[in-house]
Amino acid sequence: KEKKKINFLNPVSENPDGLGFKMNMNDIIATFACVAMEELDKSLRKRRIIGEIYREELKNLKKIKLLNYKKDRLPNYQIFPVHVVNRNKFAKFMWENNVQVNINNRRNDAYSIFGGLNKKLKNLNKVDKDVILLPIHLDLKKNDISRVIELVKKFDNL
């Protein structure tokens, strides 16, 4: 039996041939969101703590580079993107060690319906090849954060 190749970065790799997905919240999800607003400040604080720990611990690596945050701006740490050399190898390494990493906001021009890749978009071309998201969700415990950092550093030294 042929082993199926796993795409760690795009498990739903489709090439849509039409536009228009209705991705609105339904009333139940909207109610959950309204209730969650009461916890927003607490959630943002926890994400900021995790993000600052990552930034401190991962700031001087060779294969992983942090995004350049401007001094006059405060990130909300909704996601924690990093630039990484050999993103696919990094993703495979992290997934094999039971740490879920992924990519976010894939470029639309990757889909044929939008006309193909635009090589003039230099920054987009770069980040589409090397940016990956580290876990930064609210269920992370201190030992989870330490483990992510340990594995990122281990990959950096491979």
Regions from the PLM with identified roles:
Residues 1-158:
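PLP-dependent aminotransferase class I/II
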